[in-house]
Amino acid sequence: MAISKNLPLLNNHFRKHWQERVRVHFDQAGKKASRRQSRLRKAAKIAPRPIDALRPVVRAPTVKYNRKVRAGRGFTLAELKAVGIAPKYARTIGISVDHRRQNKSQETFDANVARLQEYKSKLVIFDKKTKASEVASFEQVDVSATFPVEQPAPESGLRAVEVPEQTAYRTLRLARNEKKYKGIREKRAKEKAEAEAEKAKK
């Protein structure tokens, strides 16, 4: 704040034991280890369910990045309806749902429906009557590794650069010049014809 009027000059009064409140990160390595242990504990707790949820394949926004596809937040309600899975039930079987996302591309819609159908075909669901020994025989998987997001192959490859004989620019330039110098060219041609006629008379 600027100095103004007959008021006392502002000053920061850091006298509240600020040295005790300085935040440091000396435990960075320890935190990393504890986060890893936490992930392992969570994975063991939910086993043999997948570690993560199935995500849709979406095209990245903006002109800069829309050439690539990536994993999205969740499947749309329309995509789930096409496969015949209720949104609430989808969350219980490891499928992420995003009710806000809208399908604006038929290509992406079809790709995600196929992704859901593939996941559904490989899904194993246990009921309460299933024995623990049967459950333990199944291996816990990482969904993002089992169903990876693959970049689509380009439809057309690189083409050779060909320079045509007639270009639009060249055609327009010739037409413009023809219009611009039409009168003077006609005048010169007329003068030349008259000169030749006089020469022939002599």
From Swiss-Prot:
Chain intervals for the UniProt region annotation (Disordered): 183-202
Classification via InterPro entries: Ribosomal_eL13, Ribosomal_eL13_CS
Transmembrane segments: none
Subcellular location: Cytoplasm
Keyword vocabulary terms for this entry: Cytoplasm, Ribonucleoprotein, Ribosomal protein
GO CC annotations on file: cell surface; cytosolic large ribosomal subunit; preribosome
GO molecular function annotation: RNA binding; structural constituent of ribosome
Pfam families xrefs: Ribosomal_L13e
Highest taxon above the source species: Eukaryota
Purpose of the protein: Component of the ribosome, a large ribonucleoprotein complex responsible for the synthesis of proteins in the cell. The small ribosomal subunit (SSU) binds messenger RNAs (mRNAs) and translates the encoded message by selecting cognate aminoacyl-transfer RNA (tRNA) molecules. The large subunit (LSU) contains the ribosomal catalytic site termed the peptidyl transferase center (PTC), which catalyzes the formation of peptide bonds, thereby polymerizing the amino acids delivered by tRNAs into a polypeptide chain.
Subunit structure: Component of the large ribosomal subunit. Mature ribosomes consist of a small (40S) and a large (60S) subunit. The 40S subunit contains about 32 different proteins and 1 molecule of RNA (18S). The 60S subunit contains 45 different proteins and 3 molecules of RNA (25S, 5.8S and 5S).
Record-stated family: Belongs to the eukaryotic ribosomal protein eL13 family.
Classification via PANTHER family: 60S RIBOSOMAL PROTEIN L13, LARGE RIBOSOMAL SUBUNIT PROTEIN EL13
Record protein name field: Large ribosomal subunit protein eL13
Organism: Candida albicans (strain SC5314 / ATCC MYA-2876) (Yeast)
Gene that this polypeptide is encoded by: RPL13
